[in-house]
Amino acid sequence: MLAYMSEQTIALVTGANKGIGYEIAAGLGALGWRIGIGARDRERGAEAVAALSARGVDAFAVPLDVTDDADVSAAARLLEENEGRLDVLVNNAGAAGGWPDEPTSLDPAGLLRLVDTNVVGVIRVTNAMLPLLRRSAHPRIVNQSSHVGSLALQTDPGTDLGGIGGGYAPTKTFLNAVTIQYAAELRGTGILVNNACPGYVATDLNGFSGTRTAEEGARIAIRLATLPDDGPTGGLFDDEGPVPW
């Protein structure tokens, strides 16, 4: 597990006002960390902070729409001014679109919205937070991916991924490639960058049809956020270990 610093570990979790993000925040907060609750909806973000605080978590609100440049810049300034650094970034915020979603009937505008949230949003937030992460003794970046983004699993006739996801699945494949590039560029800096596959979790993204709880889905992101300094980087993981690209 992450070697603890003398100061409290500071983490930011995007999309943390509900679902998997909320449980990631709760799990990391249970370690005694100070958790920034990134949320696009200010009111829901404040409610999540209140609920986590009632559970003993040291949480604070970070208004954050990952698709908005000004919002992301403001979030980085807030962390700079109030915390001075960032130890762990969990890019959890995401959008799903429809499912199943055949590529022959995709709405290009809808696809671009998915890419802006699931891929560009991760890049936007990561780049804004990197100066703060570089000040950490044990920096970690965890990106929320999915089994449906794995090309190996998509092309395996024995793997059931629940149908065709012509919009959502490619954004997670794109995110996987982005994570590999970040890990390659940041190798040797101490910043470990990995992708988490939470499994088929019951959230509002799938109409709560998933077979896993949000708490179960949060486990792998928590594990990757607390990797030791000699842990892996540039990988895709679920609860059972590495997932093929």
Residue map of PLM features:
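Conserved glycine-rich Rossmann-like NAD(P)H-binding loop of the short-chain dehydrogenase/reductase
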Residues: 31-47
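The beta1-alpha1 cofactor-binding region of Rossmann-like NAD(H)/NADP(H)-dependent oxidoreductases
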Residues: 42-43, 63-75
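A glycine-rich helix->loop->beta "capping" turn
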Residues: 55-57, 78-91, 97-99, 107
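Hydrophobic positions on the long internal alpha-helix
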Residues: 90, 125-129, 133, 178-179, ...
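C-terminal helical subdomain
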Residues: 173-176, 188, 195-196, 203, ...
